[in-house]
Amino acid sequence: MALQAAYEYLQQAVGHGAWSSTQTLTLLLIAVPTVLLLLASLAKSTSSSGRGKPPLPPSPPGTLPIVGHLHHIGPQTHISLQELVAKYGHNGFLFLRAGAVPTLIVSSPSAAEAVMRTHDHICASRPWSMASHILRYNTCDVAFSPLGEYWQQTRKLMNTHLLSNKKVYSFRHGREEEVCLVVDNLREAAAKSPSTAVDMSEVLAAYTNDVVSRSVLGSTHRKKGRNTLFREMTMTNVDLLVGFNLEYYIPRWPLTDLLFRLVCWKVTRHLKRWDALLEEVIHEHVEMRKLSGDKEKESDDFIDIFLSRYEEYGFTMDNVKSLLMNVFEAAIETSYLVLESAMAELMNHRRVMKKLQAEVRAYGAEKKLDMIREDDLSSLPYLKASMKEALRLHPPGPLLLPHYSTADCQIDGYHIPANPRVLVNGWAIGRDPAVWEKPEEFMPERFMRDGWDKSNSYSGQDFRYLPFGSGRRICPGANFGLATMEIMLANLMYHFDWEVPNEKEDGCWKVSMDEKFGLMLRRNELLYLVPRASS
């Protein structure tokens, strides 16, 4: 079973689905002896150098050649890791080998705090990945670049000039206009055929994509279908980045070098498409800036801001392209998937939806509003709580992007060697029964008490709740994503009543919440709902 799992991962990585059993067996026969020698050498080294040190965190039994502990992990990786920590771990820590890669699993608030606060200076780097390195112009981005001076400069640029509260707020009119387009289209669909279901997965995905494209490209975001093209290319990025990293598992022998070349070719080909498109839109912005005198304006989009600032930070145009790619990846699919899950949860919890609709509609009626605008959101506490609850149950990524320990350290009485991957299971922390009352239930009320309503829940300082991470690597675009999601959810509740297609009169019909593991959790089924304009 373990070898079959490795075989399926290899198929996904190189994009071929028809290897012969002979080819697969040949590959494994080449790899097995080498990996056994490497593991034996590593075990000997660890044994001789580890005398007198505290023990490693506990591990599951039965390490196998090549796959390590991967045979313990099913297709729902985040759930498998949660179960393994519960069975074999201690205080939320578990140490395992993913292939030949030592990996520290972090699955409790106290463990997360130890890694991302106490030892953040050691554990906040990123592991090297061949796909990410190529796709990011030799790791020129902010999300995957290792800790260091370059990362500090990119982070400073993003936080100061692109994603500050002031700059995010300056884009509010664009978000409001995109919401109006969605509301108008839904009204039209409901009027034409009151009982016809709408693919809300597509509606929400298109909306978040258009908001991001508009912020990055400005008024040209729909030119030549660019908004759609950027969305397609971003989805491919996610698939490439979540694919099996061959360099972690197979030694670099001449006979296996072909596999690495195939992966490099696939990623490089995709990068060329990105490069051509980014060159085109950047060139257009350069020409427009010449006409306007290169002066910075509040209405500047992300490309304008990069062009006015990149030389100040000593960046090249490749740095700019890599950072633009980060913006698309971080904002498009994450926001859409959380919105989709929020709507699905509300359909399964009608009491919550009615309470949310009552709050939004009472406020709108009092203020005589044609729509809920961003300036109104702070007056809607149950809306805020509902979004927090959706993010608790359905964080943008079930596992935070992998961290990397750059030096030996001691955590919770355990020796953590240098160079392991560190995976924080944010999904498991958000459902920890030791922390959350009825953790599997959708209960926004929990965020209206116990100080949650007054705290900055998204700051990463409360390690019970980490939808955007914590420490040095906390997501810099949290405010942008929240603004995008909250205004859409508010207006969907304000303007429409919602039904499930062919809904039973007794209300027992449930929307499936089954999800597929990946860099982000994607629902197994599209969300079809019937909108009815509220009276």
From Swiss-Prot:
Compartments in which it is found: Membrane
GO cellular component: membrane
Transmembrane segments: 23-43
Protein name according to UniProt: Cytochrome P450 71C3
PANTHER family: CYTOCHROME P450 FAMILY 71 PROTEIN, OS01G0543600 PROTEIN
EC class of the enzyme, as a word: oxidoreductase
InterPro entries: Cyt_P450 (IPR001128), Cyt_P450_CS (IPR017972), Cyt_P450_E_grp-I (IPR002401), Cyt_P450_sf (IPR036396)
Function description: Catalyzes the conversion of 2-hydroxy-1,4-benzoxazin-3-one (HBOA) to 2,4-dihydroxy-1,4-benzoxazin-3-one (DIBOA).
